[in-house]
Amino acid sequence: MSLIEDARRGVVTEEMRIVAAAEGVTEDFVRRGVAEGHIVIPVSPYRRVKICGIGEGLRTKVNASIGTSTDMVDVDMEVEKVRQAERAGADTLMELSTGGDFLEIRRRVVEATTLSVGSVPLYQAFIEAARKRGAVVHMEPDDLFRITAEQAKLGTNFMAIHTGINYETMKRLQNQGRHGGLVSRGGAFMTAWMLHNEKENPLYSEFDYLLEILKEHEVTLSFGNGMRAGAVHDATDRAQVQELLINAELADKAHEQGVQTIIEGPGHIPVDEIQTNVVLQKRVTNRRPFYMLGPLVTDIAPGYDDRVAAIGAALSSSYGADFICYVTPAEHLALPTPEEVYEGVMSSRIAAHVGDMIKLKKRDADLEMGHARRDLDWERQFAVAMNPERARAIRDERMPADTDGCTMCGDYCALKIVGRHFNF
């Protein structure tokens, strides 16, 4: 019996109770959200997972993606990225390796954390085809489905699956063209395979079989956005919207079959199109959880893309996005270091909180900080801060002569001056 089927029968499971307690909502609110497909709770029958609810009415969650590349294969470094992501407060991880021993890397990552771990089975299937048969276009569909099941058994409990790339989607892309090209690795692999083999995407044509595998292993299906824009000038184009419509229809089918679903969204969107994208996604998918990569709101700030994405993520969250994939300062430049993973998670967590201040009216912590600053209560300020360690380190490094204030104002602290005359 899947979580959705339990929820439909009126059963409040332990996972639902945990989410309700963590989010400050009723157990029945969570149960109804799961039953209707507005909330997902990734679980795994193969390992202990820290329970995390994603969706409508819940705090915006942050994912940290890690993984090797063909140029950098260091499993110990990837495990350290897991630690840094957890230290920074990530809610979930995705393991997206494209180099090295896939089984060993994923096993080490899964063993290093209790967070939900996502994957993209398509990567492994295509790259193994290239290693064994000389090119990604020689991937065998049976291998793709086998790898999906194997990754689930290892403890991967949500998966990005590129079902929305089919002949109709490709036609839209070919007819329209793009300024920034096709930047999704999964989208590129599948498009190349389809064109070379003159066959439909097996994840689309054999979707019923895919659902059987995912349901058997209680995997949450995250519909991949293989046609997402890689430049702001391509945002909200026909190929992106076509893929969304296909994924929306398939999500209905998956939900009917008892498979939890998330819809992934675009990665580069100008500020004035973010609300349009969130509203469109929520409308056509029947309010399923929306997972945004960033989004990045400008293309000209490499080295600072964690900040660029935080702007987009804050707005996306405020309009109703439920799940944010972090972006690191190394985006578009290099594989991130553990330190950059930490920075990326922190930037996205700040953005998620800013969005929740609007979407959920969650402002109690900000009120507490305002009072602590008014009272020059530094310990309270550190306790409320999203990163107490960093805040304390900066202050300790530049401690003022008068320890009530700080070195920004020194003797002329506005709060101390006014405090002599007002009792706020």
From Swiss-Prot:
InterPro entries found in the cross-reference section: ThiC (IPR037509), ThiC/Bza_core_dom (IPR038521), ThiC/BzaA/B (IPR002817)
GO molecular function: 4 iron, 4 sulfur cluster binding; carbon-carbon lyase activity; zinc ion binding
Entry-linked Gene3D superfamilies: 6.10.250.620, Radical SAM ThiC family, central domain
Binding residues for [4Fe-4S] cluster: C406, C409, C413
Cofactor binding, per record: Binds 1 [4Fe-4S] cluster per subunit. The cluster is coordinated with 3 cysteines and an exchangeable S-adenosyl-L-methionine.
Pfam families the record matches: ThiC_Rad_SAM (PF01964)
Pathway: Cofactor biosynthesis; thiamine diphosphate biosynthesis
Residues given in the record as substrate binding sites: M94, Y123, H162, S184, R185, G186, N225, G226, M227, R228, E264, Y291
Alphabetically ordered keywords of this record: 4Fe-4S, Iron, Iron-sulfur, Lyase, Metal-binding, S-adenosyl-L-methionine, Thiamine biosynthesis, Zinc
Single GO BP term: thiamine biosynthetic process
Keyword Iron-sulfur assigned: yes
EC numbers on record: 4.1.99.17
Catalysis performed (reactions): 5-amino-1-(5-phospho-beta-D-ribosyl)imidazole + S-adenosyl-L-methionine = 4-amino-2-methyl-5-(phosphooxymethyl)pyrimidine + CO + 5'-deoxyadenosine + formate + L-methionine + 3 H(+)
Residues engaged in binding Zn(2+): H268, H332
Cofactor: [4Fe-4S] cluster
NCBIfam families recorded: PRK13352.1, thiC
Family: Belongs to the ThiC family.
HAMAP family: ThiC
UniProt function note: Catalyzes the synthesis of the hydroxymethylpyrimidine phosphate (HMP-P) moiety of thiamine from aminoimidazole ribotide (AIR) in a radical S-adenosyl-L-methionine (SAM)-dependent reaction.
Protein name per the record: Phosphomethylpyrimidine synthase
